[in-house]
Amino acid sequence: MEGIDMIEKFNGIIYLIVFIVHFLGYAFYAYRCVFKTQDFCDEYAVDHTAAIMIRFFGSFFIGSVLVALYIMFIRPNGVEGAWGFFNLVFVQNLTAFFVGIYSIKINKLGHTEKTSDEGIYAPGILMILSAILCYGLADKIYS
């Protein structure tokens, strides 16, 4: 019965899956930035002296994942009235997408042979997923 309640809180299984996929993406980057920092630096040819700032960046993902877990498992009303969180996540993804385009296609500061378009695609996908959530859960998050 509890699983059915969770599905209902998310307006159906589709939005619950989108929510889970989105925040699994956040958890993936949080883990890599905070706990696998050296591997992260090596993959993107970033000097290890940037580790503190990379972990700082990852901490924002951790905060969002913790709030998502709270909404999913603890918060009595689930997503109801959580418009601030969902809108903040969308705006963060949107700005990361545009900053990625600027950084990879326009400015090119710090480009190496390991530079890829991941800085555009990852936030672009996350932006689309968060937009789907804002739209699909609008009746609940704005109530």
Predicted regions: what is each one?
Residues 85-103, 123-130:
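Hydrophobic alpha-helical membrane segments
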Residues 98-119:
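Membrane-helix boundary connector in multi-pass membrane proteins
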Residues 75-89, 113-117:
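Loop-to-transmembrane helix junctions at the membrane interface
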Residues 132-143:
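Juxtamembrane boundary at the C-terminal end of a transmembrane helix
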Residues 14-21, 53-60, 84-91, 119-122:
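Physicochemical signature of membrane-embedded alpha-helices that form the seven-helix bundle of GPCRs
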Residues 24, 29, 51-73, 91-97:
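Core segments of alpha-helical transmembrane spans in multipass integral membrane proteins
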Residues 2-25:
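Hydrophobic transmembrane alpha-helical segments in integral membrane proteins
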Residues 21-53:
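Hydrophobic transmembrane helix segments
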